[in-house]
């Protein structure tokens, strides 16, 4: 999902699907014909294989795995995060807002000490997940670099349930604020 411009309360949003090849479909969210957000839905299998070889990236620093039971605080997480869409609650499936929160957990457990800023995420959803199961969160740091604002890390986060991939996220953050070089 890529958010390009705000959608205001009361805006009529047109969701327009367009085939883009390889069986993928881009869904564009338009307000008065202006593109506000888009996502690309890929067919199952092969698109984001679990266990990808990261030899094309600067790093391949594997972080410890984490098992997260999708109960308690995750059941109503979307509502607390401001997404009042009742569809997921009625269907008893995990709301998509949970996945970047789990990726944030990777950052706070392993990469940051103190203040930090989440800068971007590219999220690919592979399957709906029922509430109450446990998710395996696997993460690999694939890039680190310094900017004027601080040190950044890019992490590939793979989330699976019962061995099946449900979400992959490329999660980037400023993990150390302030100039990193003298």
Residue ranges, per PLM feature:
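Hot-dog-fold acyl-thioester-processing enzymes
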Residues: 2-4, 40, 44-120, 179-182
């Amino acid at each position: 999902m890529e958010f390009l411009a705000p959608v205001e309360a009361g805006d009529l949003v047109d969701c327009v699907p367009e085939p883009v090849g390889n069986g993928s479909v881009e869904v564009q969210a338009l307000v008065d014909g202006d593109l506000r957000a888009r996502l690309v839905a890929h067919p199952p299998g092969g698109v984001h294989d679990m266990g990808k070889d990261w030899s094309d990236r600067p790093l391949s620093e594997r972080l410890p795995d984490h098992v997260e039971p999708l109960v308690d605080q995750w059941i109503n997480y979307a509502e607390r995060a401001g997404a009042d869409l009742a569809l997921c609650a009625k269907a008893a499936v995990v709301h998509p807002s949970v996945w970047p929160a789990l990726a944030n957990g990777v950052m706070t457990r392993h990469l940051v000490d103190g203040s930090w800023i989440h800068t971007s995420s590219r999220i690919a959803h592979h399957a709906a997940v029922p509430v109450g199961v446990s998710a395996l969160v696997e993460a690999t740091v694939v890039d680190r670099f310094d900017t004027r604002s601080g040190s950044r890390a890019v992490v590939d986060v793979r989330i699976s349930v019962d061995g099946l991939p449900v979400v992959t996220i490329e999660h980037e953050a400023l993990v150390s604020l302030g100039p990193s070089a003298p």
